[in-house]
A protein has these predicted regions:
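Catalytic cores of DNA base-excision repair glycosylases
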Residues: 1-135
Length: 135
């Protein structure tokens, strides 16, 4: 509840309580402002930017890191901004694309790529390192 209060105070003080007014701010100014709000980290800031403000920012979460590290595409220790940069430089900078891609990652993470993997039936299982391609 404290984090929500901090965000609400920011929204009232900086944007007159208007999400629409906040969303009109340029991304280059808005992201650092959100990160300065106590309790808002990179993932939460990017969630707000993508889903509430329709800004083309890719949201990285635990599912993203887990799926892509298990498939040998990134190191488990990759930092948030580096992983985000990989997506943003390789996907079309489009809000709809980022929302859909992130949603598919969340779905895959919740259903298959959990802390304890449930690889049976996962659509990405054939892409795991060491799994021979099927004909």
């Amino acid at each position: 509840a404290v984090r929500v209060r901090h965000f609400c105070a920011y929204l009232m003080e900086e944007h007159g309580g208007s999400m629409k007014r906040m969303a009109r701010q340029p991304l280059e100014r808005l992201r650092p402002a959100l990160l300065a709000v106590p309790g808002i980290g990179p993932e939460t800031a990017d969630d707000i930017l993508l889903y509430a403000c329709d800004k083309p920012v890719f949201v990285v979460d635990a599912y993203t890191r887990r799926i892509f590290s298990r498939h040998g595409l990134v190191s488990e220790s990759i930092d948030y901004d580096s992983l985000r940069a990989i997506f943003e430089s390789n996907l079309m900078a489009d809000v709809h694309t980022f929302k859909e891609y992130h949603g598919l990652i969340v779905w895959t993470g919740k259903d298959y790529c959990r802390t304890k993997p449930n690889c049976a039936g996962c659509p990405l299982q054939p892409l795991l390192p060491g799994i021979p391609p099927t004909a």
